[in-house]
Amino acid sequence: MKFYYHDNDSSVDQCAPHDSGEPVTAEQLEKIGVLAFHYPDVEDVNRLAKERKYTNRDEVTITPEAMGGQENYEKKLKVFYEEHLHEDEEIRYILDGEGYFDVRDKDDRWIRAQLNAGDLLILPSGIYHRFTLSEKNYVHTMRLFQAEPKWVALPRPVDNNPYRQEYVKAISA
């Protein structure tokens, strides 16, 4: 697991590392409500799920083949990479492969989280973010939910959304 500021070089593919060379600490992530853990054993994930009342989960494999071919895969990656927020926490545990979550810091800069097998990331509701795979084009992830599984992405800007407003208030305190 590695965290750093995104280089914002739009001339390079979104699946490239985009490492600016400016690292981000766990403390910086916590200030924006992002939690990160490394759990080599799924039993650790089960304990966290019980503590945080995640009652549902599913698994998703993202590859060109799993998405029905290269064209569908590329369309899906574009959707994942559009900046958005959710009204629920987003919890992802990487079972295999590699992917990137980008989140906005308090100054609206992108922080990139490089996640590999065993890494778990919790994004608070209301945080602007996006997701993409690495250049390996493969990830197998577990999604955890506190209620029935849903994935409703609200594209930016939705600053008047009550979950967004609550999030901004929480990180401004």
From Swiss-Prot:
Pathway: Amino-acid biosynthesis; L-methionine biosynthesis via salvage pathway; L-methionine from S-methyl-5-thio-alpha-D-ribose 1-phosphate: step 5/6. Binds either 1 Fe or Ni cation per monomer. Iron-binding promotes an acireductone dioxygenase reaction producing 2-keto-4-methylthiobutyrate, while nickel-binding promotes an acireductone dioxygenase reaction producing 3-(methylsulfanyl)propanoate. GO terms for cellular component: cytoplasm; nucleus. Pfam families: ARD (PF03079). Ni(2+) binds at residues 84, 86, 90, 129. GO terms for molecular function: acireductone dioxygenase (Ni2+-requiring) activity; acireductone dioxygenase [iron(II)-requiring] activity; iron ion binding; nickel cation binding. Its cofactor is Fe(2+); Ni(2+). Keywords: Amino-acid biosynthesis, Cytoplasm, Dioxygenase, Iron, Metal-binding, Methionine biosynthesis, Nickel, Nucleus, Oxidoreductase. Its EC number is 1.13.11.54, 1.13.11.53. GO terms for biological process: L-methionine salvage from methylthioadenosine; methionine metabolic process. Transmembrane segments: none annotated. The keyword Cell cycle does not apply. It catalyses: 1,2-dihydroxy-5-(methylsulfanyl)pent-1-en-3-one + O2 = 4-methylsulfanyl-2-oxobutanoate + formate + 2 H(+); 1,2-dihydroxy-5-(methylsulfanyl)pent-1-en-3-one + O2 = 3-(methylsulfanyl)propanoate + CO + formate + 2 H(+). Residues 1-21 are annotated as: Disordered. Fe(2+) binds at residues 84, 86, 90, 129. It is found in: Cytoplasm; Nucleus. Belongs to the acireductone dioxygenase (ARD) family. Catalyzes 2 different reactions between oxygen and the acireductone 1,2-dihydroxy-3-keto-5-methylthiopentene (DHK-MTPene) depending upon the metal bound in the active site. Fe-containing acireductone dioxygenase (Fe-ARD) produces formate and 2-keto-4-methylthiobutyrate (KMTB), the alpha-ketoacid precursor of methionine in the methionine recycle pathway. Ni-containing acireductone dioxygenase (Ni-ARD) produces methylthiopropionate, carbon monoxide and formate, and does not lie on the methionine recycle pathway. This is Acireductone dioxygenase. It comes from Yarrowia lipolytica (strain CLIB 122 / E 150) (Yeast). The lineage of its organism: Eukaryota, Fungi, Dikarya, Ascomycota, Saccharomycotina.
